[in-house]
Curated annotation (Swiss-Prot):
NADP(+) binds at residues 189-194. The record marks 99 as: Important for activity. Keywords: NADP, Oxidoreductase, Porphyrin biosynthesis. Its EC number is 1.2.1.70. HAMAP family: Glu_tRNA_reductase. Homodimer. This is Glutamyl-tRNA reductase. GO terms for molecular function: glutamyl-tRNA reductase activity; NADP binding. Belongs to the glutamyl-tRNA reductase family. Pathway: Porphyrin-containing compound metabolism; protoporphyrin-IX biosynthesis; 5-aminolevulinate from L-glutamyl-tRNA(Glu): step 1/2. During catalysis, the active site Cys acts as a nucleophile attacking the alpha-carbonyl group of tRNA-bound glutamate with the formation of a thioester intermediate between enzyme and glutamate, and the concomitant release of tRNA(Glu). The thioester intermediate is finally reduced by direct hydride transfer from NADPH, to form the product GSA. The lineage of its organism: Bacteria, Pseudomonadati, Acidobacteriota, Terriglobia, Bryobacterales.
Length: 421
């Protein structure tokens, strides 16, 4: 059996190449059926995301999996081997297993530690299962990759730290308030980043979202996204005493919130803490507001520094994750080696059982018939002898299976017991 993973990713190909090779979800069943129908192909999986397209195959030893993939791509995509060849990576055997485990664990992602790739792998796995393209060893390998990803996330902190500006805002809010349950959010402006930050805050327990914008219709539209309340722009400062978290991202060319206004807001809040997130450029909130007690103001640069710090920490965790992945690859390879000698072990056990059964039959003809109790005792005795005889060579077979120079020892056991290849 051969294992091959061929593909392109954000590391090897620009988006123009990746989009040429991408498979839409509705086209996967037909593509997988075509791939599975190729002579010598045992199993196949196609993973297609924004950042990578990968084809995983197991084939019979007699065929060339690289040629199969090249011909498949030429049938399904309007690309030539010459144009995509420089961007393709190909991993075989152990390297393919290592690559798959790294992809599942998000060590090969554009943002290391992001969880989306594992979900995308599971979708690809389900699609292959549904159309009968997975039914054997590759099926088990894919399942194992999910377990490896789970282990990496549980034993390292690779996915615990915010690495987007919008989520960094949520992380900081938690540090300020502890729990975000029942906190009130106001969005000033209708930018994408403020929408993402508000969405994260809502999912983290924020109870209500006010939205204001110079164009009131846009405030109404965004408020619907969060089951929130649109507020007239002229009234938003009057609403601030009710707000715990303010996200400012309006396109105003000047400050829309000044220190003296904020002083009145904090007094009205009886000095309860307030978190201000200014992700506008130019900034919306006067920086001097940060001098006030119980006010925590962060601008886009502050949030980016949090992200950069977290990315550095993630990369430290990634080193630990790489060690875990290598350990899991070693385990998988050991299992594969043992699986290779399983037919030899079965053949040995069958041969010894045949000898035992034949000798038992001779004893029955010569000294029988036996009582049920005698028969049971003889069966137990002879099976025990056979098991003891088999224990040594079976243990040696399993031991030698995991060694690069184990083939001569395995061949010697075959010869000693007259086992056929």
């Amino acid at each position: 059996m051969k294992l091959l993973i061929t593909g392109v990713s954000h590391k090897t190909a620009p988006v123009e190449v990746r989009e040429c090779l991408a498979f839409r979800e509705e086209t996967l069943p037909a593509a997988l059926a075509d791939l599975k129908a190729c002579e010598g192909v045992s199993e196949a999986v196609i993973l297609s995301t924004c950042n990578r397209v990968e084809i995983s195959l197991t084939t019979e030893d007699a065929v060339d999996p690289r040629e199969i993939v090249d011909n498949f791509l030429s049938r399904h995509k309007a690309v030539s081997s010459a144009s995509i060849g420089p961007h393709l990576y190909r991993h075989e055997g152990r390297d393919a297993i290592h690559h798959l485990f790294r992809v599942a664990a998000s060590l090969d992602s554009m943002v290391v530690g992001e969880p989306q790739i594992l979900g995308q792998l599971k979708v690809a796995y389900a699609a292959a299962k549904d159309c009968g393209a997975l039914c054997g060893w590759l099926d088990g390998l894919m399942s194992r990759s999910f377990s490896v990803a789970k282990r990496v996330r549980s034993e390292t902190g690779i996915g615990q730290m915010a690495v987007s500006v919008s989520y960094a805002a949520v992380e900081l809010a938690r540090k300020i308030f502890g729990s975000l349950t029942n906190r009130t959010v106001m969005i000033v402006g209708a930018g994408k980043m403020s929408e993402l930050a508000a969405r994260h805050l809502r999912r983290s327990g924020a109870s209500h979202v006010f939205v204001t914008n110079r164009t009131h219709e846009r405030a109404v539209d965004m408020a619907k996204l969060f089951q929130g309340t649109p507020v007239e722009y002229a009234r938003f400062t009057a609403m601030l005493p009710e707000v715990d978290i303010l996200i400012a991202s309006s396109g105003a060319p000047h400050y829309i919130l000044h220190k003296d206004e904020m002083q009145r807001v904090i007094s009205a809040r009886r000095n309860k803490p307030m978190f201000l997130i200014d992700i506008a450029v130019p900034r919306n909130i006067e920086p001097a507001i940060n001098d006030l007690d119980n006010v925590f103001l962060y601008d886009i640069d502050d949030l980016q520094e949090v992200v950069n710090s977290n990315l550095r920490e993630r990369m430290k965790e990634a080193d630990h994750a790489e060690l875990l992945v290598t350990e899991e690859v070693d385990r998988m390879m050991a299992r594969m080696k043992v699986a290779e000698v399983t037919p030899v072990i079965v053949s040995l056990q069958e041969q010894l059982e045949q000898i035992r059964s034949g000798e038992m039959e001779k004893v029955r003809r010569r000294f029988g018939p036996f009582t049920a109790q005698q028969e049971e005792a003889l069966e137990a005795l002879t099976r025990g002898i056979i098991n003891k005889v088999a224990h040594g060579p079976i243990s040696e077979l399993r031991s030698q299976a995991g060694k690069p120079d184990g083939a001569p020892a395995i061949a010697a056991i075959r010869k000693a017991f007259h086992l056929q290849d």
